[in-house]
Amino acid sequence: KANGTNFGNSFGRMYEPRYLSGMVAGSATSSNLIGYVAAFPIPEVIRGINAFTLGVREINPAAQVEVVWTSTWFDPVVEGDSAQAMLDKGADVIAMHQDSTAAGEKAEAAGARWVAYNSDMSAHAPAAHLTAPVWDWGPRYAEVIGQATAGTYEGGYYWGSMADGLVDLAPIASDVDASVVAAVAERKQQIIDGS
């Protein structure tokens, strides 16, 4: 039963690694069209698209990011069809804010590249996979459970970041240019440091 002190919200600054994934995507496009398969036009998703696009533009100012809305968090058919529509328009990189691997599978079948989401999904479309903004909820859950069992949990709002490890970037594909990998590492450290 909620009593005002035993309830809290936890979420993360996923826009931080999304920016970095945009840098990788910007380096990988030859057509300068990147398709972004997104669930719903809500602040979390729009924030991620904006961060991704800024990362793309840091590396490749000529590249464009075009969004297709699916109106679902998980529907592999809709996600795959949406990715295919972008590929048919000439996109050679597909990014996503979805929960299945369908966009990546379509990208791989077309010989395109893919920025996944949620976890390292490289095993699902290894030839297409570039990287992914990822979550690591384990330490946060352990912290909250530890506080709750010790009777010290105070609730409140937790807004995790790359600095505390709640969000991060999956390993970058080995064929991404070393200068881009170095630029991403430098920008990541700046984000963590707040500089």
PLM features: what roles do these ranges have?
Residues 1-195:
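A residue-level marker of the well-folded mature domains of exported/periplasmic proteins
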